[in-house]
């Protein structure tokens, strides 16, 4: 039998007392009262923060949105099929955040920044809150650098600058996504990081966009955030903020970013669904009272950083879908008032074969010529006025039987200018090519050609200048000015090409 000395017992007790850890973990917990339709009502969770992440017993994560006196309304970030009434929920003391980093370039992710392209995990270099405060007044500077879209109608008349927010608005099937993807394609070699956020789209549409970007080598500098139509409303609501957080990561590292929200109407509908299920009082068109704040806090994050912060930028192109061209509906008017201009795409123009179907009359950029290089200002200054006068005259000509010679000439030139603005999808033009096109049309060099010959002549003229007069493009890209030398080169090329073209037509 082993005998234990009294001093050994006291030593053992002393050791155990020294090893005792007095740390107490307080966990804020609650109980599920009710669950369904992507919403859970929780009793307890007394000290939960607004927007805090909560974790259910079976692993589902939710966000506490409604803090009421008797219970907490939580929106689920999953289907929540395994959550049972009476099961426990614990607060995580964390606000929604996502991993960020360079490794996200070229990847397709969901609203929680998890990869969904089947290419393995992504190694993040840090974390950012999904909802961050927008830069203040002192942190910004006014927009002054152009962000070229490669679309002649936009770059010449509705210019977009780095750090601007320009709304793309129009009915369904009018080419809104095409304008956005063409802008991404045109950023190749411009050192601009692009983020494309697809909200509530068909999975096939998103796959089509990703394929286009991959084929053209644009995925190297692009991140796609996708929450398709079958995703929970919570994730569709969060997706734009996830995209903004990723773009901000690059903006605060003195880089230029472009973010496309396709589209914010679907996000507003997802938020309306969540709000009605949370029993928040409905307002106009059954949207909750804070739907304006939903979009303003998102779009205000787009900015041009001040010199102190390294002059990074985040340019936002939100897309909004209208019903039968009604721009006075609730969401369109809200987003128009938040953004720095809008590009209006018309179904009538689209059906008439004018693509991109941009209605130049009611489209506007509130930054204006500050977002254009000097060469473009010099050449395109008269273009919008000419087209506006042409549209007016065309409407009048439908009723007038006999027009004077000057009016007939103006109509002919307007038709040729409109022909020049037509562009096929995924075929962005360089600034020099746009200047060639506009200069030729504005100065009447195309008036002698048939309407059907205009496109062919311009394509051949661009090729001729590129091969025989490369100096022209050098001048535009290096000086950004349409100098006398550049003008002389262009006029000479137009004359040479016109002679050659007319000879070809006679043969």
UniProtKB/Swiss-Prot annotation:
Record's bilayer topology term: Peripheral membrane protein
Residues annotated to bind ATP: 170-177
Alphabetized UniProt keyword annotations: ATP synthesis, ATP-binding, CF(1), Chloroplast, Hydrogen ion transport, Ion transport, Membrane, Nucleotide-binding, Plastid, Thylakoid, Translocase, Transport
EC top class, as a word: translocase
InterPro entries with a match to the protein in the record: ATP_synth_asu-like_sf (IPR023366), ATP_synth_asu_C (IPR000793), ATP_synth_asu_C_sf (IPR038376), ATP_synth_F1_a_nt-bd_dom (IPR033732), ATP_synth_F1_asu (IPR005294), ATPase_a/bsu_AS (IPR020003), ATPase_F1/V1/A1_a/bsu_N (IPR004100), ATPase_F1/V1/A1_a/bsu_N_sf (IPR036121)
NCBIfam families, sorted: atpA (TIGR00962), PRK13343.1 (NF009884)
Family stated for the protein in its record: Belongs to the ATPase alpha/beta chains family.
Function statement: Produces ATP from ADP in the presence of a proton gradient across the membrane. The alpha chain is a regulatory subunit.
Protein name per its UniProtKB record: ATP synthase subunit alpha, chloroplastic
Organism: Ipomoea purpurea (Common morning glory)
């Amino acid at each position: 039998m082993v005998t234990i000395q009294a001093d050994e017992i006291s030593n053992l007790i002393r050791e155990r007392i020294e090893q005792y850890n007095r740390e107490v973990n307080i966990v804020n917990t609650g109980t599920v009262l009710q669950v369904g339709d992507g919403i859970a009502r929780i009793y307890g969770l007394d000290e939960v923060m607004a927007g805090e992440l909560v974790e259910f017993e079976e692993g589902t994560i939710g966000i506490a949105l409604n803090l009421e006196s008797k219970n907490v309304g939580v929106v689920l970030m999953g289907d929540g099929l395994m959550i049972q009434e009476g099961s426990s929920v614990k607060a995580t003391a964390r606000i929604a955040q996502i991993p960020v980093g360079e490794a996200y370039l070229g990847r397709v992710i969901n609203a929680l920044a998890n990869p969904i392209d089947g290419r393995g995990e992504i190694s993040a270099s840090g974390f950012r809150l999904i909802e961050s405060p927008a830069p203040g007044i002192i942190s910004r500077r006014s927009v002054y650098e152009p962000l070229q879209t490669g679309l002649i109608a936009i770059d010449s008349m509705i210019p977009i600058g780095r750090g601007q927010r320009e709304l793309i608005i129009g009915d369904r099937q009018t080419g809104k996504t095409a304008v956005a993807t063409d802008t991404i394609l045109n950023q190749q070699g411009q050192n601009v990081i692009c983020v494309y956020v697809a909200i509530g789209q068909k999975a096939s549409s998103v796959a089509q966009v990703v394929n286009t970007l991959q084929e053209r080598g644009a995925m190297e500098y692009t991140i796609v955030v996708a929450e398709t139509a079958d995703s929970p409303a919570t994730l569709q609501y969060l997706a734009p903020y996830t995209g903004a957080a990723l773009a901000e990561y690059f903006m605060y590292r003195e880089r230029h970013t472009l973010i496309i929200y396709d589209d914010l109407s679907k996000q507003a509908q997802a938020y309306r669904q969540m709000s009605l299920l949370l029993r928040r009082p409905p307002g106009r068109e059954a949207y909750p009272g804070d739907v304006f704040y939903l979009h303003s806090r998102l779009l205000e994050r787009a900015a041009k950083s001040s010199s102190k912060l390294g002059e990074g930028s985040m340019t936002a192109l939100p897309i909004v879908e209208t019903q039968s061209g009604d721009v006075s509906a609730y969401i369109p008017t809200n987003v128009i008032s938040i953004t720095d201009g809008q590009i209006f795409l018309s179904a009538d123009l689209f059906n008439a074969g004018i693509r991109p179907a941009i209605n130049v009359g009611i489209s506007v950029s509130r930054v204006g010529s500050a977002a254009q290089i000097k060469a473009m200002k010099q050449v395109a200054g008269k273009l919008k006025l000419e087209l506006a006068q042409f549209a007016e005259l065309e409407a009048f000509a439908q009723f007038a039987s006999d027009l004077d010679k000057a009016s007939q000439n103006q109509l002919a030139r307007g038709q040729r200018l409109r022909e020049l603005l037509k562009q096929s999808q995924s075929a962005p033009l360089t600034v020099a090519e746009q200047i060639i096109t506009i200069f030729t049309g504005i100065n009447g060099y195309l008036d002698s050609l048939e309407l059907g010959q205009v496109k062919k002549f311009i394509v051949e003229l661009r090729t001729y200048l590129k091969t025989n007069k490369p100096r022209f493009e050098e001048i535009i890209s290096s000086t950004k000015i349409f100098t006398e030398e550049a003008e002389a080169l262009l006029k000479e090329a137009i004359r040479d090409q016109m002679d050659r073209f007319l000879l070809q037509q006679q043969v």
